[in-house]
Regions:
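Short, intrinsically disordered or compositionally biased N-terminal tails of bacterial proteins
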Residues: 1-15
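Hydrophobic alpha-helical bundle cores within soluble ligand-binding/oligomerization subdomains
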Residues: 14-23, 27-409
Length: 409
């Protein structure tokens, strides 16, 4: 249940998600006594088997994760390979912590920040470690606005490239200068979205004004931006750190981050979720429509996340806010019904991609706005990762294991 919204639904505990004690013990290569010890220490979840008062079932996800960790300790080379796919941490960062069911920015709950702080305030926290007013950048000279008929990512990338070419301080990588450049980039991203200079307005205020969503909608827009500010070492953050490690300026970091974010396996998933909601708007009954979509080989976009067992807290807050402010609207009722149907069929919770698409649907935002919100918010994290990477002075240069034809073969 999403507090205050009554978006309650039942998650199916399918047999595919749970296993018997004998199967779990076999996969882990341990005795049942050791398995029970893992349960008591919180490493493996268990629940009573259906129709039995004594037999218990064990979480397949937990068992697989525990087995992977054991194998990684025994074979470090395999651990290095797996680190590139939801594996063990490979870089240190003090920006974001994903802890089970919560997301933190520098030790502060991101959901709480999303209800009370602007994106610029969170940017100051992430970039400097403190809530302090960032020094305003010098005005950008006359720069032509990119054509409005190209996608937002392309508009932002072209605008950043042109401004970078004329910014004499683009390569000033001192910490104090980076925060100023970061704020300039954040304003340029907002400008690319609304087609005009936001001036001194915060990103959420500028977007809310351009999109005409009123006070209720402005709160949702602000929260969406803050919730997207960072999410640890995802593909775009890693891309940003790699680019920064070469010594490239922050404009290049964000241009590269946008390229990574746009992919359908990353931030582009929000666009897919937006399209899915549009196509399902009048489908009834929704549960059967969701099942039919799966039968056609089409995914239920915006559901499930490997790092959150009990659901993505970013989506939870966005749905809560929508329910608090638009609970009686037809679009929110549709979103709520869709969440119930999709969760019942798939056993998955909505993630941030769905949350952004739901916000766009309920607020009647322009097409593509879920990705726009994601990208502007995540700009803060990319710059934060760049600042951390610049400070290390290290070039990120992993090695590849050659598996091709042997020389002379």
């Amino acid at each position: 249940m999403y507090d205050g919204v009554n978006v309650d639904y039942t998650i199916n505990m399918t047999t595919a998600s749970w296993m018997s004690a004998s199967e779990a013990s076999r996969l882990l290569g341990v005795t049942r006594a050791t398995l029970y010890a893992y349960v008591s220490r919180g490493f493996v979840r268990s629940q009573a088997a259906s129709g039995s008062t004594r037999e218990r079932m064990y979480s397949r996800e937990d068992v697989e994760r525990l087995r992977q960790r054991t194998e990684e300790r025994r074979a470090p080379d395999k651990a290095a390979a797996r680190a590139l796919h939801w594996g063990m941490p490979i870089l240190e960062s003090s920006i974001a912590l994903i802890d089970g069911s919560r997301l933190y920015y520098r030790g502060l709950d991101a959901a709480a920040l999303a209800r009370s702080r602007s994106l610029e305030e969170v940017a100051a926290l992430i970039w400097t470690g403190r809530f302090e007013a960032l020094r305003a950048p010098a005005p950008v000279g006359r720069v032509a606005q990119p054509a409005p008929d190209i996608p937002f990512a392309a508009r932002a990338q072209s605008l950043l490239a042109v401004v970078a070419a004329h910014d004499p301080l683009a390569f000033d990588l001192r910490s104090a200068s980076l925060a100023v450049t970061g704020l300039r980039i954040l304003r340029l991203m907002t400008r690319a979205a609304i087609g005009a200079d936001p001036g001194d307005r915060t990103a959420d205020a500028a977007l809310a004004r351009a999109w005409r969503v009123g006070t209720r909608g402005a709160d949702v827009v602000r929260a969406a931006l803050v919730l997207c500010a960072d999410h640890e070492l995802n593909v775009s953050a890693f891309t940003a750190r790699c680019v920064a490690s070469s010594g490239s300026h922050p404009y290049a970091v964000v241009i590269a981050g946008l390229a990574a974010l746009e992919g359908p396996k990353h931030g582009g998933a929000s666009i897919r979720a937006e399209s899915m909601l549009a196509s399902m708007r009048h489908a009834r009954p929704l549960r059967q429509a969701v099942s039919a979509r799966l039968r056609r080989g089409e995914p239920i976009d915006g559901f499930g996340h490997p790092l959150y067992r009990e659901g993505d807290p970013r989506a939870r807050l966005l749905l809560d806010l929508l329910g608090e402010r638009y609970g009686t609207s037809a679009e929110f009722r549709f979103v709520r019904e869709f969440v119930r149907a999709a969760a019942d069929v798939t056993g998955e919770h909505p993630n941030v991609d769905f949350g952004l698409a739901a916000a766009a649907r309920v607020l009647k935002l322009p097409a593509g706005s879920p990705f726009t919100l994601f990208a502007i918010g995540r700009t803060v994290g990319w710059i934060g990762h760049a600042i951390e990477q610049y400070a290390t002075g290290q070039l990120i240069r992993p090695r590849a294991r050659y598996v091709g034809v042997a020389p002379g073969a």
